Amino acid sequence: MSAAIRENELLIRACILYESLDDKPIAESYKNFCRKVGKDIMTLHDFDYWFYRFHNGNHDLYHDRSKDPKPKSLSDFPIGVMYDVLGHVDPFERLVLRKVSRNLRDVVQKMRCELDALYVNKENTCISIGFGQGTITYSQVDNGCQVDQWKSSSGYKKKFVEGGDFMELFNTDFRTLLENKKVILNSFDVHHYLLARNGTNEEQFLDHLIEIIKSSNKFTTRSFGIGDLSFDKIARFLELMEPKSLEKLEIGNIIGSTDYDHLVNTEQWKTLKHFISECVEISIPIDHLLHFTTMKVDLTELTVHDALKIRDMLDTSETFDYAMIYVKMTDPIEVARVFNPEYNNDDNQNRLFYYTNPGNKKFAIGSSKSMLSISDLASDYFAD
């Protein structure tokens, strides 16, 4: 295409008019236009304007676009309309829309937002936020931060923030997400790695995370999972969560102090229904575990005296369903005989027997030298 045509606005519009009359999809028409006229002549946004204007019968090549009525943005619509539209927007898009205008931010903050799952994952100089439908990943690279967004519905989008710091960008977006007081989570999980090996700004990351959650005032989630921390830091996280809403805690490896006193004295711990600490031995006394509806735990020890406390709990609890306790018992037969005086297991294999409490509620009990399981026969957790 000659330079004369490329610099003549009317001729360029005539080329678009020709494409609009060819009755092809706009994507194909734009590709053909770029091949003939040049890729740098017009953006798809501007091509779209003229293409559909001509396609709808408005063939005036001299039309002054600047005199068109200013198109309304979403934030110009009545509040009721904005609520209807934003009700169909996913968490990714709400995060972006909050930054568009004060009106949109105010509406998004007032809308109930229930997420099935939210997780934060940190590994060295990379942090991800996962919403279930996809992820946003912040990676520190040369001269800035690479932000990658993946959604199951639309695939990948990438953005480079020159001079950006991955942790600062994460902190900003995560804080923005939690500013909505009506965000309700079914589960929230924090994963972080390499703390035990090199501690690369892990403490700073965790402290920022605690500060952001704390600033959200009332952080509501039904389930919380975290690991590679001390009991004390886990307690600091728990204290930020609404105790009446938090039902389940799952912890991974314990690093640092194993002093459990702070943890077991939080209101959140005392009102938990479900607790999991598989694959990590904990030294929390059995007294602090007996209020759970279900639990799967690795304990450092389980004595006959502990078994008596468990039996007393079975005799009175109206909420207990299931317990799986992994432990290397020094006297497994005597522990089992707390529930069945005639129990005998010479080969130390897992044996199933039953215990009936004074209220005639029946429990299935499995016992071996390394495990004790208890199930209420009326609960969904029991299986033959």
UniProtKB/Swiss-Prot annotation:
- Which named protein is this? F-box A protein 224
Family label = Belongs to the FTH family.
Q: Which PANTHER family match?
A: DUF38 DOMAIN-CONTAINING PROTEIN-RELATED (PTHR23015:SF4), UNCHARACTERIZED C.ELEGANS PROTEIN (PTHR23015)
Membrane-crossing residue ranges in chain numbering: none
The gene that this protein is the product of is: fbxa-224
Q: Which residues form the F-box domain?
A: 71-122
In which organism is this protein found? Caenorhabditis elegans
**Pfam families, per the entry:** F-box, FTH, HTH_48
